Amino acid sequence: MHQTEAFAAGEEAEELRPSVESDKKEERILARRLRLAARKEAQTKQRLGEDDLGKEDVKEETRKSQKEVEHRERRMAKLKSDGLELVTNIQVAADARESDRRTELEEGHRLRREKLENEAKSSQEKFEEINRKWTDAKMKQTPLDLRDALSSQQQLCEQIIADKNKLISELQQELKASDDRYVKDLKRQAKDIDLLVERMEEQISTLKKSYREDLHQIENSLDEERRTLLTKHKKKWEHERKDRNEKELKNMMQSLSVMEEYADLLQKLRVQTAEEYNIDKIRMDTEVQKLRMKVQQTKFNCHMNEEKLDYKYEVLKKKEEENAIIKSQLKRKIIRMQDVLNNLKSKLTKQEKQSKAGNQSLSNDYTRISQQYKDMQKKARHFAALDAERLEKLWLMCEDEAKALTHRALETDRVIHEQQLGLEWASPPLPFMERSGAVQQKTFRTATQAAADTLKGEPEGGLDEDTAAGLNKRTVKSILELLCDEMGFLVESKLLMLLSPLEKNEQSLIKLDAIFSAIGIESEKDVYKMAEFFMNYRQHESKYTKDETANGQGESAEELSNLIHTEDLLAALKDFTAQFCRQDVHASHKSSILGLDMRDDSEDAAYWESIANVMPESKLKLWDALDTALNKYHAVLTERTELLMETQNIQQQNSELRQLLHLYTTSKAQ
């Protein structure tokens, strides 16, 4: 009866949308929940890009399925509230009875305490009276008086015992009444529990039935909405496709019109160029006429200069006579200077002897330092080989670990696609799986090695070949020799003293090494870049054509000076170092001096990046979305498991309570 009334009230409340401004607490809570659910759904759609309509106005009317879900949620909330009220009514009544029972029990305790206190007082008074009479009885001497006193004392004791027995009987009656009342309470509680279980089972069956109906209605509304959305999106797609076709046709027509405009513009430019050529020709003819007039003026100036020279010749004759006098004076001065010269020659002889001794000492030092340098090169190569071997081992270990992780990630992706999503899985391209070991190292020749090979080349055949940069070796050799001759100030004076006993090629090689160290040239590529820069420098300054530069590459050093003049060499070198050479070249120059191979690690980052990015960003987003959905599903399953276990425990407790109650009532009845 109560359940039917609650269901009817719920049907009436379903027509009203809950509001946060409602007077009822349940409706306000439900309205907040619905608003939070709608907000979370909108955020999820915006993050995953599932629905472009998520960016529309917030006041947009909710979908039909959402309305159906909200309607069913309000109905179920009302049904749960009514069912909970029916179940808790029994508990409220039991609590009220228990409160009354405890009140009566406290009142009975109070009355019993008062009775016990009154009886204790009266018993104490009677006991004191008995003690006083014993004192009086001891003072009596006749047996008759003693018998009367003893009888009186006996009556008083019997009266005390009678009062005690009366109190005990009253307490026993109350105890029996409490036992009877306890049995009645147990029976009443058993009836309440049965009624409670019956109402709970009835409520559970009603909720199950309502849940099934709501689920069926929600599924129907979702199917209908899905069909509507499919139809809507199909129409939208057709409309977009038509618009795209129209835009492509429009763009094609615009391209044709632009091509026609460009053709007209090209014809106009041709006509304009022809007109400019005619204007330039007229201007050049005018300049030629001006130059001819200038030549005539120059001839006139030459004639005037001849007359001036004749005048100066007469003046010089007079000066010659004066110079004869001065010459005689200078002869006397020369004699004095010869004496000074002889003294200086003797000093020079002594200085040469000292210089030879110093050179011999420096030569010995150079031999010793050269041997130390070779030993250091040998050790450096040894350690470089060890480092390369360690790098290869570490590379292979990291590569194996990365490939294992890649296989694991691909297997996980395959399981997700095939088992969780039901899609066909295709393996992405894995070019790094087909290779093993470090990225191939590139060995660069140092600038000193390239200079040594160039300077030692034979002119018959080796110098006529082209380098890897497309330059002629003869030209490169000429540039290096020009550097040795003109850039000697970059070499230390002590080093120049050590180079005097060496051959010319060795001197040039050591000078070039010092010059390269000073300007920051490290590799063979830098040498060829410098040579090309020098060849183009004079061309850039004098606006020579590239054909003249190409014809001059195979000529001698004298012809090279026409391309880069010795006076321009220092300026060209400054420009080259400012544009191409780095400021901090100490570390790389040290490795070039030791003769170590320089490893190109430019492709290492791309190689490891390709392994790290084997999974595209789209798949990672798919994994995150799937992980979130599975976590929610797991949370729902966990909650259902806990509820089932709790229900089973409650059922087991109810059955145990029924058995205990049945045993207790049976034992009381017996």
Curated annotation (Swiss-Prot):
Composition skew (Low complexity), residue ranges: 1-10
Reported function: Component of the nexin-dynein regulatory complex (N-DRC) a key regulator of ciliary/flagellar motility which maintains the alignment and integrity of the distal axoneme and regulates microtubule sliding in motile axonemes. Plays a critical role in the assembly of N-DRC and also stabilizes the assembly of multiple inner dynein arms and radial spokes. Coassembles with CCDC65/DRC2 to form a central scaffold needed for assembly of the N-DRC and its attachment to the outer doublet microtubules.
Entry's family note: Belongs to the DRC1 family.
Subcellular location per the Swiss-Prot or TrEMBL entry: Cytoplasm, Cytoskeleton, Cilium axoneme; Cytoplasm, Cytoskeleton, Flagellum axoneme
Subunit record text: Component of the nexin-dynein regulatory complex (N-DRC).
The species this protein was found in: Danio rerio (Zebrafish)
A Gene Ontology BP annotation from the UniProt entry: cilium-dependent cell motility
Coiled-coil ranges per UniProt: 55-261, 326-382
Signal sequence, renumbered to the chain: none
InterPro entries assigned to the protein according to its UniProt record, in alphabetical order: DRC1/2_N, DRC1/DRC2, DRC1_C
GO cellular component, one term: axonemal dynein complex
Protein's name in the database: Dynein regulatory complex protein 1
